A protein has these predicted regions:
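Active-site recognition of the HExxH zinc-binding catalytic motif
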Residues: 298-311, 342
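Hydrophobic alpha-helical signal peptides and transmembrane signal-/tail-anchor segments
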Residues: 1-19
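Auxiliary, metal-adjacent structural segments of Zn-dependent hydrolase domains
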Residues: 97, 101-168, 188-219, 231-281, ...
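Short, hydrophobic/amphipathic alpha-helical patches that form generic packing surfaces
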Residues: 203-214, 336-351, 386, 414-438
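Post-HExxH zinc-binding segment in Zn-dependent metallohydrolases
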Residues: 312-380
């Protein structure tokens, strides 16, 4: 029996070695369960729509009307291309590279006790997960727990947990089944095609944590200098556990008008800032949970910004009533900030890995970014306009200072999660990506991506957002989106990125 187990593992290992030298990070598989074709259809539909819009746009310069990128944006993306190449080289040169992308596979069919129990779920009872998603996770059998671990990505341990839902098949296996057949069943139930897909995901995750490290490392060093602290125990998320529940649920507008937009329509993941983590791991050992397959990588980047405290690092909300008189509730500014960064960076990773599989040249990368980023910027503004339209509002309604207009608009606006930050503010910011990056260069004293913490940071950000409300190019494009009919495929989606 031990001999057969040994032979099986050798064959399994050879499968990975055979593919290792030419890892293709392209996530476009034939996987019907996750239906990546829907993502491609969305991007293709909007891209075609965008081309039509350009003929009618009144924008100029680097706006969506011309589809051009500024020199600053081009320079930023060129720098990120070099960082992604460095991440690629680091991962391939790492002595533990092979073991880091070969998972431990734990069979869990018929044994819920064998599943991992993230501390956040135990403590917070799955925040932001709708009953539809929690019911799905309760009723759909998780057949395998795949655990990947990279112990040293620039000093950080990154542990990836993928909860795999297999195909049908019932009944528990007989207790007399041999160990070798049990292992063989485990591997075959998680198809090699799916294992290859998961491996590409994990590789991209590792590259992300290599990429983001310098920005957060500068934060730690600066804070330690300011506080005269060099104690390694204070380091943020030295170990981070990432839990992926790849449920098939899409973010969609309600079919019937009048329903308040909430977690079912917008949320995909959650975490705590490392310094506020109430779990047993404290600041050093933290968690991020992703509970949809849709836009999972963009959401990981969003949650990482929160987790590593690259945002304003405050739960205090900000009143925007003097900028948007119709918005009477206070807003979490960090949500708009990190969502904007996640969408901008998502384009860099999408082009590098999903289009070219990590093998594109600088020229190919720059050309693809020049095509993808303008579409992303326009899509963000389109989603902003569409979200307000669902509530019977226009952008001019929410910025109009007239008391009668703002009061009428305030009665129409309703949310049960951070809709305004995710869609309206982030839509404005991504559309004005060049201005946003210039603002980060001038106002973020620690690093490009590290926001100034606390009220000072949110006040500066509020001033910047207020200035964007007067941007004529953006206002002209908002009017265009309000009047130009979109393809039917785009009417209901609440996804936040065109490319994923």
């Amino acid at each position: 029996m031990l001999f057969y187990m040994f032979i099986f593992y050798i064959l399994y290992f050879i499968f990975y070695i055979y593919n290792i030298q030419n890892i293709n990070i392209n996530m476009r598989t034939d996987d019907d369960d996750h239906d990546d074709n829907d993502d491609m259809d969305c991007a293709a539909a909007f891209s075609t729509y965008f081309d039509r819009l350009k003929k009618h746009s009144r924008g100029s310069g680097s706006g969506s009307g011309s589809g051009m990128m500024s020199a600053n944006l081009k320079s930023m993306y060129r720098n990120w291309f070099q960082q992604l190449r460095e991440a690629d080289a680091f991962l391939h040169a790492s002595p533990s590279f092979i073991s880091a992308i070969v998972p431990d596979i734990i069979p869990t069919r018929g044994n819920r006790a064998a599943l991992p129990r993230p501390a956040m779920i135990e403590r917070d009872k799955m925040p932001f997960m709708t009953s539809e998603i929690t019911d799905y996770l309760q009723k759909t059998e998780v057949t395998h727990w795949l655990k990947y671990a990279a112990s040293n990505i620039r000093g950080r341990s990154v542990i990836v947990h993928i909860l795999h839902c297999g195909g049908g098949g019932g009944g528990g296996s007989s207790s007399s089944s041999s160990i070798s057949s049990s292992i063989s069943s485990s591997i075959s139930s998680v198809s090699l095609k799916r294992l290859k897909m998961y491996r590409s995901y994990v590789y991209k995750i590792y590259a992300w944590f290599h990429f983001i490290h310098p920005y957060q490392q500068q934060t730690q060093q600066t804070q330690q200098t300011q506080q005269t602290q060099t104690n390694k125990e204070n380091e943020c998320s030295k170990e981070i556990n990432l839990y992926f529940y790849f449920t098939p649920f899409k973010k969609l507008l309600p079919r019937a008008p009048g329903k308040t937009l909430g977690p079912a329509h917008a949320n995909t993941g959650f975490t705590y800032p490392c310094g506020m983590n109430p779990g047993p791991g404290g600041k050093k050992s933290t968690e991020i949970i992703i509970f949809r397959h849709e836009e999972w990588f963009k959401v990981l980047m969003h949650e990482t910004f929160h987790n590593l405290e690259l945002d304003f690092n405050t739960e205090s909300r900000t009143s925007l009533r003097d900028v948007f008189p119709a918005i009477r509730h206070d807003v979490l500014m960090s949500e708009a900030y990190v969502e904007t960064w996640a969408r901008i960076l998502n384009v860099a990773f999408y082009v590098f890995y999903d289009i070219y599989g990590g093998n594109g040249t600088a020229a190919q990368y720059n050309t693809a970014v020049a095509r993808c980023l303008p579409v992303e910027r326009a899509f963000s503004l389109f989603q902003s306009v569409k979200t307000l339209k669902y509530m019977g509002l226009t952008f001019s309604d929410i910025v109009n200072p007239d008391p009668a207009v703002s009061s009428a608009a305030a009665r129409k606006y309703a949310e049960d999660t951070n809709i305004f930050a995710y869609y309206v503010l982030a839509g404005m910011l991504v559309f004005n990506a060049d201005e946003f990056l210039q603002w980060c260069v001038s106002k973020n004293a620690i690093s490009l991506m590290q926001a100034t913490h606390g009220q000072r940071g949110t006040s500066l950000f509020k001033q910047f957002i207020s200035s964007l409300c007067k941007n004529e190019r953006m206002l002209a494009n908002i009017k265009l989106f309000e009047t130009f009919e979109a393809p039917e495929h785009m009417h209901s989606t609440m996804r936040m990125t065109a490319w994923s």
